[in-house]
């Protein structure tokens, strides 16, 4: 018998041993469900429809359980009263950095020396708050008008047709790109604005090709053709967002200047800086468009809700100091005086925001539950919270949780409703579209302002209609669970025109 055969047999025996060695539940640990396939466990079910799979597991095991997914043991926690015990736990016990770095490298080919997400967040946080937030908000309003009104005027009078997702995603990402990454250098003319529209459209259409393949990228399931396409798209984006190319742009945000300085201080090459800027384009702009899509679609399908929002915006305009055509900014005090639109946004996010909140278990620990129970977690496992199922879709918390109710987050007096209950106790975490704890989204204020400004402009400056009024709201693209805002399985055709 040759050595090659001997080694082959030994390798096969070792693989068989690894595949047949099954973990057993220890006293004090959550219920364990390994599935029927060695090593893979529930990977196929989880990847096909994470929400459906986790719903079945919750019905079977309760609000905490451990499942085997592709060789990893993942403990899933679905009790919102207990989420704070996870999201504020120190990194020495529950770490979210390792998984973030893994996705950063796998999806965007970004490798940063001595990367510390916590340090990066502390440096970038001031660029998204207070006066810097106001500067971003003002610039976003200007750039939304540039792309939204400018494109429509260029296309001529009358009705224009487009998919609602392309409409929302395209205009918001393009305006967001111009806001964060800069506009054409002075002088500021109609020609420079036209060039901004052309350039930002190029960025969006290229980015969208990558975005469509993002779930496959994250799971490592690209076909040979997909890999070739992804390589070309990434190369194009790296050129569009290279620091050298961006250096000539005007009115770059303080966020961009601070981020580039941060990369330079780490000694990151220009090529890697371009990759990091593509990552940041997705992180800062990738969810606003889908969020606006769902919000507008829910309004178009609910005449009462649409009338309530329009009425609120008309009141805002009546109190404005100048006509909307002359407004160069939408002040924060105006944005903060839209409780109906705030409720609509909160309800839309409740129904469609489905991020995973993950932590790597760095050391064996006891996880305290809000009801007094305690469960042991093993070092090397992964801990997963999925707020989309609970609290956001929990029928004990929300009556008719699958139904869009535009005033769900309003009290009878018109103020914001914050009191929601589960098991007779008031919830602190009653909806978590922005994450929670140490890795809550820093750009929440900027994103909310941007979405509200977009909706304000669309509903006050345009007529917007469904081409088929009785069209059904599309199902989710199930592959996007875990990545933030869900996207539809297919787009919804609309027509729009500037109001006469």
UniProtKB/Swiss-Prot annotation:
Superkingdom field: Eukaryota
Could you name the Gene Ontology cellular component terms for this entry? caveola; endoplasmic reticulum; endoplasmic reticulum membrane; nucleus
- Which amino acids does the record list as binding substrate? 106, 112, 287, 358-359, 382
- The EC number(s) this enzyme carries: 5.3.99.4, 4.2.1.152
* Localization annotation: Endoplasmic reticulum membrane
- Pfam families, alphabetically? p450
Molecular-function annotations in GO? heme binding; hydroperoxy icosatetraenoate dehydratase activity; iron ion binding; monooxygenase activity; oxidoreductase activity, acting on paired donors, with incorporation or reduction of molecular oxygen; prostaglandin-I synthase activity
Regions crossing the membrane:
1-20
**SUPFAM superfamilies, alphabetically?**
Cytochrome P450
Per its UniProt record, the required cofactor names are: heme
**Which residues participate in heme binding?**
441
Q: Which UniProt keywords apply?
A: Endoplasmic reticulum, Fatty acid biosynthesis, Fatty acid metabolism, Heme, Iron, Isomerase, Lipid biosynthesis, Lipid metabolism, Lyase, Membrane, Metal-binding, Prostaglandin biosynthesis, Prostaglandin metabolism, Transmembrane, Transmembrane helix
Q: Its Gene Ontology biological processes?
A: cellular response to hypoxia; cellular response to interleukin-1; cellular response to interleukin-6; icosanoid metabolic process; negative regulation of inflammatory response; negative regulation of nitric oxide biosynthetic process; positive regulation of angiogenesis; positive regulation of execution phase of apoptosis
Annotated signal sequence is: none
Which Gene3D superfamilies did the record assign?
Cytochrome P450
Q: What is its main location?
A: endoplasmic reticulum
Question: What's its catalytic activity?
Answer: prostaglandin H2 = prostaglandin I2; a hydroperoxyeicosatetraenoate = an oxoeicosatetraenoate + H2O; (15S)-hydroperoxy-(5Z,8Z,11Z,13E)-eicosatetraenoate = 15-oxo-(5Z,8Z,11Z,13E)-eicosatetraenoate + H2O; (15S)-hydroperoxy-(5Z,8Z,11Z,13E)-eicosatetraenoate + AH2 = (15S)-hydroxy-(5Z,8Z,11Z,13E)-eicosatetraenoate + A + H2O
Q: Which family does it belong to?
A: Belongs to the cytochrome P450 family.
**What does this protein's UniProt record list under function?**
Catalyzes the biosynthesis and metabolism of eicosanoids. Catalyzes the isomerization of prostaglandin H2 to prostacyclin (= prostaglandin I2), a potent mediator of vasodilation and inhibitor of platelet aggregation. Additionally, displays dehydratase activity, toward hydroperoxyeicosatetraenoates (HPETEs), especially toward (15S)-hydroperoxy-(5Z,8Z,11Z,13E)-eicosatetraenoate (15(S)-HPETE).
> What is this protein's name?
Prostacyclin synthase
The organism encoding this protein is: Bos taurus (Bovine)
The gene behind this protein is PTGIS
């Amino acid at each position: 018998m040759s050595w090659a055969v001997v080694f082959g047999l030994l390798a096969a025996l070792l693989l068989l041993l690894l595949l047949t060695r099954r973990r057993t539940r220890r006293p004090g640990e959550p219920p364990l469900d390994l599935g029927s396939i060695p090593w893979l466990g529930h990977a196929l079910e989880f990847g096909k429809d994470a929400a459906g799979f986790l719903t079945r597991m919750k019905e079977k095991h309760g609000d905490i359980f451990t499942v085997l997914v592709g060789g990893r043991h993942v403990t899933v926690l679905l009790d919102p009263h207990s989420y704070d015990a996870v999201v504020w736990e120190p990194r020495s016990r529950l770490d979210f950095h390792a998984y973030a770095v893994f996705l950063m490298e796998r999806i965007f080919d970004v490798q940063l020396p001595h990367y510390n997400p916590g340090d990066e967040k502390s440096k970038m946080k001031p660029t998204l708050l207070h006066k810097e937030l106001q500067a971003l908000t003002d610039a976003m309003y200007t750039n939304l008008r540039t792309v939204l009104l400018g494109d429509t005027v260029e296309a001529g009078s009358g009705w224009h047709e487009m998919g609602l997702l392309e409409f929302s995603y395209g205009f918001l990402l393009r305006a967001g790109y111009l806001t964060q990454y800069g506009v054409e250098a002075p002088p500021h003319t109609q020609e420079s604005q036209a060039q901004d529209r052309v350039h930002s459209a190029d960025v969006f259409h290229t980015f969208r090709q990558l975005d469509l393949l993002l779930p496959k990228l994250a799971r490592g399931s690209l076909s040979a053709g997909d890999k070739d396409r992804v390589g070309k798209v990434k190369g194009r984006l790296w050129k569009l967002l290279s620091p050298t190319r961006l250096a000539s742009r005007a009115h770059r945000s303080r966020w961009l200047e601070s981020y580039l300085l941060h990369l330079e201080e780490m000694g990151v090459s220009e090529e890697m800086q371009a990759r990091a800027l593509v990552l940041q384009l997705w992180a800062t702009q990738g969810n606003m468009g889908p969020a606006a899509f769902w919000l507008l679609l829910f309004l178009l399908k609910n005449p009462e809700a649409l009338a309530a929002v329009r009425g609120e915006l008309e009141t805002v305009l009546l109190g404005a100091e100048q006509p909307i055509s002359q407004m160069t900014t939408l002040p924060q005090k105006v944005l903060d005086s839209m409780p109906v639109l705030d409720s609509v946004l909160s309800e839309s996010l409740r129904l469609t925001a489905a991020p995973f909140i993950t932590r790597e278990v760095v050391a064996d620990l006891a996880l305290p539950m809000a009801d007094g129970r305690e469960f042991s977690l093993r070092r090397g496992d992964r801990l997963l919270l999925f707020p989309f199922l609970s609290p956001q879709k929990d029928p004990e918390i929300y009556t008719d949780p699958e139904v869009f109710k535009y005033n769900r987050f309003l009290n009878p007096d018109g103020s914001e409703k914050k009191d929601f209950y589960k098991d007779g106790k008031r919830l602190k975490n009653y909806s978590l579209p922005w994450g929670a704890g140490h890795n809550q989204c820093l750009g929440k204020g900027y994103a909310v302002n941007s979405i509200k400004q977009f909706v304000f402009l669309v509903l006050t400056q345009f007529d917007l209609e469904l081409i088929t009024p009785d069209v059904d709201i599309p199902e989710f693209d199930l592959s996007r669970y875990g990545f933030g805002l869900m996207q539809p399985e297919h787009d919804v055709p609309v027509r729009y025109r500037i109001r006469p």
